[in-house]
């Protein structure tokens, strides 16, 4: 009986050591959860905002990074950029690049994007801007028109990419 209790205590101690806090090289933060088969960590470019969050900018799981949808918010002001669709689309792609960088990846490693447009009439403009950022071997992509986006954004993009280096 004592051996069983000791074994259970040992397993409890081992399992409680699975999560740990780490910082990325670029000053972003990451929270890791280690297991025998994969590593999962949250990614925030720069310091994470204070208070509770309902989503993370990105999650790294193994060798993949999954980003949340990025909209045209200027990270310095937390305001939507001015200048219409084109300005928002450029900011979205800059924000996406920053999140990928914090995760140890970059635009060249993107495998798949999902683009959400508030108005499908912006599709051709989006393609022109998108092409400037994904020059060679563009990723697989889906584009969907939606009724409304957060903060009345006109475009949102999420991505799945390979991690080039592990920032643990």
Enumerate the language-model features and the residues they cover:
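Bacterial N-terminal signal peptides
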Residues: 7-15
């Amino acid at each position: 009986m004592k051996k069983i209790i000791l074994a259970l205590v040992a397993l409890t101690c081992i399992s409680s050591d699975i999560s740990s806090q780490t910082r990325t090289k670029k000053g972003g933060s990451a929270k890791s959860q280690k297991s025998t088969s994969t590593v999962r960590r949250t990614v925030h470019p720069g310091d994470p905002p204070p208070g509770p969050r309902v989503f993370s900018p990105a999650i790294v799981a193994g060798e993949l990074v999954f980003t949340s949808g990025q909209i045209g918010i200027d990270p310095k002001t937390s305001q939507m950029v001015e200048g219409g669709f084109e300005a928002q689309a450029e900011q979205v792609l800059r924000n996406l690049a920053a999140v990928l960088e914090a995760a140890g990846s970059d635009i060249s490693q993107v495998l798949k994007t999902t683009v959400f447009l508030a108005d499908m009439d912006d599709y051709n403009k989006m393609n022109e801007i998108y092409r400037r950022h994904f020059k060679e071997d563009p990723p697989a992509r889906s584009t969907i028109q939606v009724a409304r986006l957060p903060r009345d954004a006109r475009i949102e993009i999420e991505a799945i990419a390979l991690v080039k280096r592990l920032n643990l």
